[in-house]
Swiss-Prot record:
Compartment annotation: Cell inner membrane
Key word Transport present: yes
UniProt signal peptide: none
Any one GO molecular-function label of the UniProt entry: zinc ion binding
Keywords assigned: Cell inner membrane, Cell membrane, Membrane, Metal-binding, Transport, Zinc
Membrane topology of this protein: Peripheral membrane protein
Family: Belongs to the inorganic carbon transporter (TC 9.A.2) DabA family.
Protein name, UniProt field: Probable inorganic carbon transporter subunit DabA
UniProt: Zn(2+) binding residues: C313, D315, H473, C488
Keyword Protein transport part of the UniProt annotation: no
Length: 776
């Protein structure tokens, strides 16, 4: 069960690696495992690589290197000449349900596999729903026991009239306890020890979406030091279905015998090794030249005081805007840091009883912050919301209130033809709203301790500019249940505005500055920290809390705003072709159209999110400032000379790099296997349980991952599934020490889930599976 990775709910939908539970295996071993248990590829179809080769996207040098890593010595041309014309791979073994030739009934087009997936999925949707319907299943008996009770009633199999009574009688004989069911199922079905573990994993992968949701519940429980049994009970339900379909026949022509033969004969099938070589060559074609270019660049900064400094999130969408800002304002410097700005907070929305974690999902909140409370909804409004959630509201709501919504619908539709307004990211995000304030007694000393560590970690240890912008990011989209996937992942799938408001408020506090000066981190009197928000759908920079500035700072503000507008215009012009707009158009037109994309109900691609991500670079900005990284790189500020004990490097490897790896693998999986790890067609999404996830249509498994429109433009892929290249500027021995202290990052590097490069010397070094550095 540890192989099942969690998937987060819609209101905190962060990118996560669906392969996280397989990280103890090498990448190639995991490819074999996924093929065995789910018929899931860890690569694109081979034809995609051949097309990339013909287009020149895969270089001959990269293919030679990829072949040499496998021990091939015959040269690339001989390998290409041996390319088989027709590939007919042996299919993976089936589950028992798939071995029944009989469909669900003589008049049904469904297979038994479809029936099992549908029944379990609909039951899970009803069981886990807390926010959508007013009627809920009785939870007193437990997840498995309630499912079994449903199966023992005639209505539990209403979609299977031809088999209902037979299955109901078999359900009567199943154990009422999940653990007893698992034991009884193993005894009845007699799975061989050799393939028991992958078979159990295959059972869970049959409803992979709901298994991932159960794994999420277990993850959340683990953060609290607790346990959750839903995933194990889901396994019991899956095994119970296998037992329900087992007719007891054990002859050579029985379904049971076919199932046993399948697993015995196909257990050791492998993923296509040639395609994995193409996959590696595709990665090397980007990674190797970039690593070499980084080694050529100097990390030295001049010592002059910059006119402006701006700290952005490491999100790949920040890189083009940072480059535009530096080109527009040459005396500026930009930095990259995790978008929660080192503040591990949970944020309580006004009027809510729940504090939302707004930090990387790898971490637990350290404290809570909130803004001024909003007025509570009236009784009438609460009653109206309850009516909207009632089982019959889907019909009655349209009949009784449809016309009342007509004017609003017409207004929204008409507004798409005019200049769209800035997104209202939070109802309380207004100049006169209260700042988020720590509620757990976080005093001056604790704030000073936090800030004194954050400033050098962000690269702000030297001379501070008159303006220091702390730039979070957010996106604005309409009619998209997966909108949180476009927000800041480091903020738990929310905008980063509250973090930068909080931190800027601290850094502008005279009392805190006085304490920092005593600690040896004096801030110049004319330095102003200004919170800002990068709107990724339109590449605008929205300044926050400018009304609180001093008169002197407000007098300087128009000049800053003009510089930011110019940088945004340059970034928009460069991004325009990617979203189907003409780069030569007037900036006012581009801005309006990009805003409209975010406000358009029918727009399936308001922005490309993190599509294209392939690089993580931890180095001084001087190392990358001259490079056009094409919006594909997570850029984290790091200067090894300011990190004598290596703790900063360890923290980068353990958190930001792992988060970047998760994002990279989310996009990888949704592209390489959209059937299993993507959420399908965005136009067909229906929300499940208010916040749990989506169905594609109204049937099938819970869909996880990204919609197809997030990685494909209708003509071609917009994301190439390449494993992350993590490029670190630090001496190789220092980097090796940090890896030794962080087992998870080392595991990812040695098992090939990411490629770790040291770009400190004249030529790059890559960390290999044997635990050492080598030249590629």
């Amino acid at each position: 069960m540890a192989a099942i990775a969690p998937a987060w709910p819609l209101d905190s939908l962060v990118a996560s690696s669906p392969y996280w539970g397989l990280r103890e295996q090498s990448f190639s071993q995991a490819a074999d495992t996924l093929r065995l248990v789910a018929d899931s590829p860890l690569h694109l179809p081979r034809g995609e690589y051949l097309a990339a080769w013909r287009r020149g996207e895969i270089s001959a040098a990269a293919l030679e290197t990829a072949l040499s890593e496998t021990g091939w010595t015959g040269g690339a041309q001989a390998w290409l000449d041996a390319e088989p014309r027709d590939v007919d791979p042996v299919p993976p073994p089936r589950l028992l349900a798939a071995c029944h030739r009989e469909a669900a009934g003589p008049l049904s087009a469904q297979s038994w596999t479809d029936v099992v997936i549908q029944q379990i999925s609909q039951y899970c949707a009803a069981w886990f729903d807390r926010d959508q319907a007013n009627w809920h299943l009785d939870h007193e008996r437990g997840f498995y026991a309630a499912w079994l009770e449903q199966m023992r009633h005639p209505y539990g199999l209403s979609a299977l009239p031809e088999r209902r009574e037979q299955l109901r009688l078999r359900a009567e004989r199943l154990p009422g306890d999940a653990e007893a069911m698992l034991a009884a199922g193993l005894a009845q079905l007699q799975a061989e020890p050799e393939w028991l573990k992958p078979w159990l994993q295959a059972l869970l992968m049959r409803n992979n979406g709901w298994a991932a949701w159960c794994a999420y519940l277990g993850w959340q429980a683990g953060l609290k030091g607790e346990t959750d049994g839903h995933l194990r009970q889901l396994l019991a339900i899956q095994m119970a279905w296998e037992c329900l379909l087992d007719d007891g026949a054990r002859g050579p022509d029985s379904a049971w015998a076919a199932w046993h033969r399948d697993w015995g004969l196909r257990l050791h099938g492998r993923a296509d090794p040639r395609t994995l070589i193409w996959q590696r060559a595709h990665e090397l074609s980007l990674h190797a030249p970039l690593a070499q270019a980084l080694c050529r660049e100097s990390a030295a900064e001049d010592g002059t005081r910059p006119a402006m400094q701006a700290v952005f999130c490491i999100d790949v969408r920040s890189e083009p805007l940072r480059r535009a800002l530096e080109q527009t304002v040459p005396a500026s410097r930009t930095y990259g840091f995790a978008g929660f700005f080192g503040l591990p907070l949970a944020y309580r929305v006004p009027g809510s009883d729940v504090a939302q974690p707004r930090l990387p999902v790898l971490l637990a909140p350290g404290w809570e912050a909130s803004a001024a409370p909003a007025s509570k909804p009236s009784a009438a409004r609460r009653g109206w919301r309850a009516f909207q959630r009632s089982p019959l509201s889907g019909f009655a709501l349209v009949e009784s209130a449809g016309l009342a919504k007509l004017a609003a619908l017409a207004g929204r539709s008409k507004a798409r033809g005019r200049q769209a307004a800035l997104p209202q990211l939070d109802p309380w995000l207004t100049p006169d709203s209260a700042k988020p304030v720590p509620r757990d007694g976080l005093g001056l000393e604790r704030r000073a301790e936090i800030v004194s560590g954050l400033l050098p970690a962000m690269g702000l240890a030297g001379a501070l500019a008159p303006w220091v912008l702390l730039v979070g990011h957010a996106s604005h989209v309409s009619n998209n249940p997966q909108a949180a996937a476009l927000q800041c992942g480091a903020c738990g799938g929310h905008g980063g505005h509250q973090h930068v408001r909080l931190l800027a408020g601290w850094l502008n506090d005279p009392a805190l500055r006085e304490r920092l000066a005593a600690l040896g981190r004096a801030i110049p009197a004319d330095t102003v920290f200004l919170p800002a928000l990068h709107l990724t759908h339109s590449d605008e920079i929205l300044l926050l809390d400018a009304d609180t500035l001093s008169a002197d700072a407000r007098a300087r503000l128009p000049g800053l705003q003009a510089q930011l507008r110019a940088a945004s215009a340059l970034a928009r012009r460069r991004r325009a072709p990617l979203v189907g707009l003409a780069p030569e158009a007037d900036d006012a037109i581009l801005l309006n159209k990009m805003r409209q994309k975010g406000d358009d109900w029918a727009e399936t691609r308001p922005e490309w999110g993190l599509a294209g991500n392939a690089l993580f670079i931890a180095a001084p900005r001087a190392k990358t400032r001259k490079l056009d990284l094409g919006g594909r790189a997570f850029l984290h500020e790091y200067d090894w000379r300011a990190d004598p004990d290596g703790k900063g490097l360890q923290a980068i490897l353990a958190a930001p790099m792992v988060v970047a790896h998760w994002i990279n693998m989310q996009y990888f999986a949704s592209t390489a296997d959209p059937r299993r790890f993507g959420s399908g067609n965005k136009l067909l999404h229906n929300v499940v349980g208010g916040r749990i996830g989506v169905f594609e249509g109204n049937s099938g498994d819970l869909r996880i991952g990204l919609a197809w429109q997030s990685v494909h433009d209708g003509q071609r892929l917009r994301h190439a599934p390449l494993r992350l290249a993590a490029c670190i500027d630090a001496p190789p021995d220092r980097l090796a020490e940090a890896l030794a202290a962080q087992p998870v990052p080392r595991q990812l590097a040695e098992n090939g889930w990411l490629h770790l490069y040291c770009v400190h010397g004249d030529t790059p070094l890559r960390w290999h599976a044997d635990g050492g550095w080598r030249h590629d």
